[in-house]
């Protein structure tokens, strides 16, 4: 029942339109406002260890990574790029610092793009013409990756520290040099470890150019801290239409970066939602062990790549309502659980059978969804909500 209060209904919440950008192709992945926001990560292996690097790329691909970056600090790493680029399932970007000759090695190796750091490549300004010519001939884009920790000393001297203005001016200066040589397939990042400074830098940059932007909070920290920093910064920017690719930088296995990145995009409806688990934080009203129940359901549905919302609720306050709103859910109490499927109670089971029943029903619903849309492409990990 709807109660009218004589007030206009607010519009449905939506994000700001994507900021209009020029379009690039990184391998087979489109980048820019005409394409979905993509998730990137970076290998932690030694690039010259080809087998280990390709194994990690395969793991990242399976986790939903769209583009992968590899380090190239030595000649032996540069020598390995061709084989890695040839066998990788997703586009490979070479990450170049200090030595400009590795830029040309990466281009010759068939990498899908090259990231250059103008702050630490010796005499980079004087080599831009050569880089632009080689990249243009190969048809690959260049990412100008400015980082607060390695900002060009000219801009450090001018601004005193890595301010948003310093980061943006450094990036646009280098972009202008490429443009002077007729090369415009450019993507830019201006990373900082402080999310507030990072957001300000990207807002300033977005207002001053039409290049696609790669978002990142650099050196974000361990998994928990880095996840919070990245989610806050990405949410602030993406909700305003700013950002075309993202990389969550964590002191954690790179697969975790991809999981967080995908979840950020799903949370903003910028990527099709996968399995979602909704669960309550628990309180004194809970009549079951919500933590254990939620974790067991999540583990049992791991890898089920269908857009199901599963609600696991611990009491009768919000439990029935949340369970009815989900595709599948349980409202628990008094040692038992009411199982809901698409808003209807289908059975009541003992507490010991809740997890097993939810998993069985989730598998059944997933099979039905597959029959209705056999060509559907899995889009991530299941989401389970426990309340």
Swiss-Prot record:
Family the entry assigns: Belongs to the IspG family.
Function: Converts 2C-methyl-D-erythritol 2,4-cyclodiphosphate (ME-2,4cPP) into 1-hydroxy-2-methyl-2-(E)-butenyl 4-diphosphate.
UniProt xrefs under PANTHER family: 4-HYDROXY-3-METHYLBUT-2-EN-1-YL DIPHOSPHATE SYNTHASE (PTHR30454), 4-HYDROXY-3-METHYLBUT-2-EN-1-YL DIPHOSPHATE SYNTHASE (FERREDOXIN), CHLOROPLASTIC (PTHR30454:SF0)
Reaction catalyzed: (2E)-4-hydroxy-3-methylbut-2-enyl diphosphate + oxidized [flavodoxin] + H2O + 2 H(+) = 2-C-methyl-D-erythritol 2,4-cyclic diphosphate + reduced [flavodoxin]
Record's protein name: 4-hydroxy-3-methylbut-2-en-1-yl diphosphate synthase (flavodoxin)
Names of required cofactors: [4Fe-4S] cluster
CC cofactor note: Binds 1 [4Fe-4S] cluster.
Keyword Heme: no
UniProt EC number: 1.17.7.3
Alphabetical UniProt keywords: 4Fe-4S, Acetylation, Iron, Iron-sulfur, Isoprene biosynthesis, Metal-binding, Oxidoreductase
Signal peptide as annotated in the record: none
Record pathway: Isoprenoid biosynthesis; isopentenyl diphosphate biosynthesis via DXP pathway; isopentenyl diphosphate from 1-deoxy-D-xylulose 5-phosphate: step 5/6
Residue(s) carrying N-acetylthreonine: 2
Entry's Gene Ontology cellular component terms: peptidoglycan-based cell wall; plasma membrane
An MF annotation (GO) of this entry: iron ion binding
UniProt xrefs under Pfam families: GcpE
Database matches in NCBIfam families: ispG_gcpE (TIGR00612), PRK00366.1 (NF001540)
